[in-house]
Amino acid sequence: QMCIRDRVKRLWVERNKDGSWDAFSDDGAHIKFGKGRGVFTPGDLMKIALAGCAALSSQFAIEHTLSDGKGARIVVDGTYDADSDAYINFNEQVVVDATDAKLSEEDANKLKERVTRHIEKGCTVKHTYVQETPVRMDVTVRR
């Protein structure tokens, strides 16, 4: 669930001389993005947001069953439609490596259910992507 702090965190982007961009938050987070090799595109960041949200949402369920420090490997891809210049769907594969735990089939199924439940309940990004989300934009030109 989104907390109040997430709603008031200030985020902004700035262009670099080399053409890449940097994203910042007022609490010190930073990521480079743009077009080209070695940087994430905005579309990549959408997919990373979805995977990251699933990772954080499922972390407790996985650590509770396996041990601290364990987590899922989450791969997200999407179908891009050039006509609408939009992603029309995302596919998320959540893989939990529990080979060291030697879980029974029943315990593995319980973990799968818990991970699914935690992501379904707690992933704000997924909740946002599933619904149609209005975006308001205001353009200001300073002179």
Region spans (language model):
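Extended beta-strand/beta-hairpin segments
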Residues: 5-48, 59-143
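Alpha-helical metal-binding/catalytic segments enriched in His/Glu/Asp
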Residues: 53-54
